[in-house]
């Protein structure tokens, strides 16, 4: 058997420490063809270019 990193007594420590956040109610995502259309619009129609004309998948900054 392989070596285990740390004792199994500490298993799940981080998960038990994180505060529980309730799921939020969101509008439903389109399915199938409509979802593909949404992706197309997001990627190619509302183009957000970076410096040098590059596109980024997650242009938050």
Curated annotation (Swiss-Prot):
Alphabetized InterPro entries for the sequence: Ribosomal_eS30 (IPR006846)
UniProt key word Ribosomal protein: yes
This protein's record includes keyword Oxidoreductase: no
Subcellular location, principal: cytoplasm
Keywords: Cytoplasm, Nucleus, Ribonucleoprotein, Ribosomal protein
GO BP annotation list: cytoplasmic translation
Function: Component of the ribosome, a large ribonucleoprotein complex responsible for the synthesis of proteins in the cell. The small ribosomal subunit (SSU) binds messenger RNAs (mRNAs) and translates the encoded message by selecting cognate aminoacyl-transfer RNA (tRNA) molecules. The large subunit (LSU) contains the ribosomal catalytic site termed the peptidyl transferase center (PTC), which catalyzes the formation of peptide bonds, thereby polymerizing the amino acids delivered by tRNAs into a polypeptide chain.
Pfam family, one: Ribosomal_S30
Species name: Schizosaccharomyces pombe (strain 972 / ATCC 24843) (Fission yeast)
Subunit structure and binding partners: Component of the small ribosomal subunit (SSU). Mature yeast ribosomes consist of a small (40S) and a large (60S) subunit. The 40S small subunit contains 1 molecule of ribosomal RNA (18S rRNA) and at least 33 different proteins. The large 60S subunit contains 3 rRNA molecules (25S, 5.8S and 5S rRNA) and at least 46 different proteins.
Subcellular location: Cytoplasm; Nucleus
Region named Disordered: 1-36
Miscellaneous section: There are 2 genes for eS30 in S.pombe.
Protein's name in the database: Small ribosomal subunit protein eS30A
Family: Belongs to the eukaryotic ribosomal protein eS30 family.
Gene Ontology molecular function, alphabetical: structural constituent of ribosome
Gene Ontology, cellular component aspect: cytosol; cytosolic small ribosomal subunit; nucleus
């Amino acid at each position: 058997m392989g070596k285990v990193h740390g004792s199994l007594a500490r298993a799940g420590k981080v998960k038990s420490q994180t505060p529980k956040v309730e799921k939020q109610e969101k509008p439903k995502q389109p399915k199938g063809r409509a979802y593909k259309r949404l992706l197309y619009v997001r990627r190619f129609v509302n183009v957000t270019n970076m410096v040098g004309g590059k596109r980024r998948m997650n242009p938050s900054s």
